Amino acid sequence: MKETAEAFLRRHDMHFAQMPFDELVRRYRADMDAALAGRPSTVFMLPSYIRADEEPRRGEAVLVIDAGGSNLRAGMVHFDENGQPVIDALRKRRMPGAGGEEIDAETMVEEIAAFALEYARDCRGACIGFSYPCDVLPNGDGRILRLGKEVQVRGAEGLLLCSALERALQRMGAPGERTWKLVNDSVGSLLGGMAEADRSRYADYIGFILGTGTNACCRLPSAEIIKSPEAMALGGVTIVNVESGCFGRLLLGTADRELDAVSNIPGDHLAEKMISGGYYRQVLRQTLRIAAREGLLSPESAAALEELRLTSAMVDAFCLEPQGDNPLADALSDREERSFAAEINTMLLERAARVSAACLAAIVEKRALPAGSRVCVCADGTMLRLNPVLRPRMEAILRRECPEVEMEFRFIEDATLLGCAWAGLTGE
């Protein structure tokens, strides 16, 4: 069935070989360079205004907040005399607005501030890792652009989050005034990797998230961020948020176009819709539905696929045992159909691995690292952690296509909290 599956994917512009790796890297590079210069691009290259070549202050505790999709964490972190991060205190609760009932932005801010209040009393620095789109400002604050579907908060768009949190803390009696910074999840992962890793081991660091969504960030000379005089004025090396999930210079296949047309954001986040866990399961299911429409699967399988609500865990199980006891295998009529679907899944995951690896290769190429350099890919996300095919294929592609640079994936526990600590204890 391999030839039939391959021919089917090629006919629908969905075979991985139809996007040559070198061309993907070239397009990523071109878009990165255009965005840095302020020209039209499908990626954003947003400066974080955080210097990446400064060591965090030692012996000083900083308030850290991790506002994720479903959970909120707050605590204190300091770096010891050896420069190693130490979590002094930590607590967790559900993210305000994630309980199913809509709240307003003021309530969200009040609940976050109240949750962090006991730690804020002892810190003059603070940093929040915010997992939703924000416009990070030169002063470290962040303006909320929108919140994801995981939380229901009205009136949050346009809010300067750090300023609002500081005002709320002062109303609650927190002494003094804290200096705030806001980082997104990929920046937090990169800084968390720098905080935890043996920094003598790596020539560079990349933050890479591939879970429900996807994003990457990198370290660049501030002088290269031509579109931002404030970032250029920082000097040295700063961290840049690629917003790689928005990359759009891709060959979209039939299933990609059909899913994009019915999405909440048609024409946007095209790479994310092709590779991330929140979308990949839909791409696989839609591709199999198309195969059923064309008579490549039985009517019984077609009906079962219509009823199946495919999850990432189901995809992972099918990767491991395509003929086994799992919902996707059970939805297909016989061994031959399961083999066909397994070939489709393998080739679509290869496509996702290539698109993901091309982003990392473009960053490494732009950094022009010496041959023999080792790069720490500070990684996070369930798709990278749990899917049994994707990351091994990414690593194999990178070894083949970028043999002069070793890219080592590291999953850092509490990466966002440690990254917030690094950001909050550098600069003024």
Which residue ranges define each predicted feature?
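Glycine-rich phosphate-binding loop and adjoining helix at the ATP-binding site
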Residues: 93-110, 134-199, 204-206, 222-246, ...
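Short glycine-enriched loops at secondary-structure junctions
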Residues: 78-81, 128-134
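Short, acidic Gly/Pro/Ser/Thr-rich loop/turn segments
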Residues: 72, 133-137, 215-217, 249
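ATP-binding/phosphotransfer module of carbohydrate and carboxylate kinases, centering on a glycine-rich
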Residues: 1-90, 94-124, 170, 195-196, ...
